[in-house]
Structures are given as C-alpha cells and as structure tokens.
Curated annotation (Swiss-Prot):
PANTHER family: L-THREONINE 3-DEHYDROGENASE. Pathway: Amino-acid degradation; L-threonine degradation via oxydo-reductase pathway; glycine from L-threonine: step 1/2. Catalyzes the NAD(+)-dependent oxidation of L-threonine to 2-amino-3-ketobutyrate. It comes from Cronobacter sakazakii (strain ATCC BAA-894). Homotetramer. The gene is tdh. Zn(2+) 2 binds at residues 93, 96, 99, 107. This is L-threonine 3-dehydrogenase. Binds 2 Zn(2+) ions per subunit.
Amino acid sequence: MKALSKLKPAEGIWMTDVPEPEVGHNDLLIKIRKTAICGTDVHIYNWDEWSQKTIPVPMVVGHEYVGEVVGIGQEVKGFKIGDRVSGEGHITCGHCRNCRGGRTHLCRNTVGVGVNRPGCFAEYLVIPAFNAFKIPDNISDDLASIFDPFGNAVHTALSFDLVGEDVLVSGAGPIGIMAAAVAKHVGARNVVITDVNEYRLSLARKMGVTRAVNVANESLQDVMNELGMTEGFDVGLEMSGAPPAFRTMLDTMNHGGRIAMLGIPPSDMSIDWNKVIFKGLFIKGIYGREMFETWYKMAALIQSGLDLSPIITHRFTIDDFQKGFDAMRSGQSGKVILSWD
C-alpha cells in the first residue's frame, strides 16, 4: 500500500510502498479517507532535535485522520464494516494505576500513532478498537480528520469554567485558534488571542475572537483597557511554548487566575515565580485528550453550531503531499487536509 514514511534521519518525508498492516484480535482495520498534517509531522519532516530523539526510522507517520472500518478483529464488539471513524492517537497500556483508575490520558506508557508505531499517512491503518471513535453522520470528513488537534484545543479550553470569564490565548496556531473559538462558543466574555503571525491572527478573527492582537506592534494592556478590563484575565490558555508570551500571560492574569498549558516551552524557561505565588495562580499541564470525554465534547460542540471550517485553509490529494507540507512549513496556513480517495 502507499504510505508516507520517514525513511532516513534527514529532512523530508517520502512516499513509499509498505505491506498492509495485520489486524489483531482487538483491532480495527481502517481504510483512510482523509488525513491532516500536524505540527508534530512538520517536526518529523524537519528532523529537529525532538524527532531525532523520538522517531525510529523507517516509520509511517501521521495521526490525524478519518476513515472507514474495513476489517474487525474477532474479539471486537460495537463496530461494523462501513463505520466511519477517527481515533485516539495515544495507545495506552491498560495496566498502570492511571489506566486502571480511568485516567487513561495520563498513562505513563503511552505509545503514539505515527510516532512510536505506524501512523495514518497510509491507505490503511490498524488501531485497537478501544481507540476508535465513531463519527456522527452530520459531521463532515474534513472536520473529522482534524478531531485529534481539535481535541487538544477542547481539552485545554475546557479545563476550567469559562462562562462569563475573560480569556487570554497565547499562540494563534490552529490549536490555539480552535481553543479560542471553543471559549467563545461556550460563553466566555472576552476572548483575546496573541501572536506575531498576521496570517494566523486573521484566521482567528474569522473564527470570532473578541480581539486578535499582534504583540509585535500592539500593546496587550492597551487592548485590555479598550475592552474595559480592570482586573486582568481570569483564564489563560498557553498554546505557543514561547517564553515571552507566557511571561506576558503571567503579567496580565488576575489574582486567582487559572492557566492551562499545552504549548511546550524550552526546558530552561525562566519566569518570575513571585507572580505565580502572590497572585495565587493555578497552572495545569495539558497533554492529549481525555479518553474519551474530550471526544464526546468535540462532537457535541460541532453539532451545537461551532463552526471550525475557516481553520481548514488548504486541501491536496495525497500525491501532492509535498505541497501540503510546504504550506504547513510556510506558517501561512491553517489546517492542511490530504485526501486519499
């Protein structure tokens, strides 16, 4: 079958021919319809320091997808041939304390689809049936293919009560923009997103944020004054991993504010801890999606009217995958969809 693989320790992704995966007793075989390119896939393409430490080569990559069930393991119940599914990309052990306690998203033995085991940039994918999520009929293939990153956004945004709150989102990548849209949809008062990429800030405006602020030429404090904010932000969603953005967030949080962090900062990032302590801030790290509460919330948000369509900016056939990666690497894109049909 056709598959996009990391073949060697160098920049690039290559189209390859690999054997179709075998279906285990508890697995589903999924025929891929559409995939989306994640920032993680760009890291793998670029072969940066994280990729060099993490990705065994050769490896079929990719973990954002929608497809159709075409094979079912003999122990699997609850699925049938033809079901349209996406899936949780974190394969968990089922045996550690967190898994046994129902906190599977915190499994210490997590294996990543398209990172540590063969991924979805292929004609067929095998995953445990436990990880598959049936897509409701009124959700499109395009939207279903970005459920993985949308789940990161939903998990982060809904970590805290947002109704009536002023929310600061730092980082207008696709996940940050989707998190801001979720916050607005569920009843936040002001949702302000910051970045220095004007293209992505314009996408955020299309998604309905209160203000999209280019901090290279506009003061966040001035925007807060303009919005009539006198006490700071109640909730911060840190999506950028950029130390200056996080420091600005700490400066502008209200006392007792809550911060959810999805962005990955440098390991040696320094902050003024006095602001955390004396403001009484609560900081929560976010990884992946809650299994499977986040998935149910994703579907419900879209079915209740949340419009994510502006975040999908580019569509290519799989034979034009290089154009898709070029668009993602340029920084002038939202989500990029690759069609396998």
